[in-house]
Amino acid sequence: MTKIIGLTGGIASGKSTVTKIIRESGFKVIDADQVVHKLQAKGGKLYQALLEWLGPEILDADGELDRPKLSQMIFANPDNMKTSARLQNSIIRQELACQRDQLKQTEEIFFVDIPLLIEEKYIKWFDEIWLVFVDKEKQLQRLMARNNYSREEAELRLSHQMPLTDKKSFASLIINNNGDLITLKEQILDALQRL
């Protein structure tokens, strides 16, 4: 029987680094963010849905989604956030389910990286849930450095996500990413060996 492990965390918690280590260890990982980017590409299902909802002002000069502008429009307004979630979640869920079902045919163990795994109620999809955990202050610092956000912008982004401390109770494994890369890699390799 196939074992499916959900990988989650928060913005700037280090999920991408963890995913890279898992892939380098020979495991397949479905990355929800990559799925979303494909769906938002010109002509994709999310592209069409967002264009119908918000109009052509969300496009750049090449007709692609202007992601910073789209993000600003959605995060600036709580009603837009709700509408965006409702609009996008069913399309994303369908595509993730399709990819999950395909991997079930070929893999004994695989991972699905979903940032909002708990919030969007994907829990029942998984045999285990691994949480990439980082302290809030470190998360803020990483987000400000990575995205060139002010502290206020970073705090606003974090305020729209479930705190990582609240996600701990859902996790089968907590990957502590407050240390260095070597320590992180050791934790992951140890967990993978126990599968």
UniProtKB/Swiss-Prot annotation:
Keyword vocabulary terms for this entry: ATP-binding, Coenzyme A biosynthesis, Cytoplasm, Kinase, Nucleotide-binding, Transferase
CDD domains: DPCK
GO terms for biological process, alphabetical: coenzyme A biosynthetic process
Principal localisation: cytoplasm
Broad class of enzyme this protein falls into: transferase
Pathway: Cofactor biosynthesis; coenzyme A biosynthesis; CoA from (R)-pantothenate: step 5/5
Residues engaged in binding ATP: 12-17
Subcellular location field: Cytoplasm
Family indicated by similarity: Belongs to the CoaE family.
Catalyzed reaction equations: 3'-dephospho-CoA + ATP = ADP + CoA + H(+)
Alphabetized GO MF terms: ATP binding; dephospho-CoA kinase activity
EC number(s) stated in the UniProt entry for this protein: 2.7.1.24
Summary of the function given for this chain in its UniProt record: Catalyzes the phosphorylation of the 3'-hydroxyl group of dephosphocoenzyme A to form coenzyme A.
GO cellular component, one term: cytoplasm
Entry-linked Pfam families: CoaE
Name of protein: Dephospho-CoA kinase
PANTHER family: BIFUNCTIONAL COENZYME A SYNTHASE-RELATED (PTHR10695:SF46), DEPHOSPHO-COA KINASE-RELATED (PTHR10695)
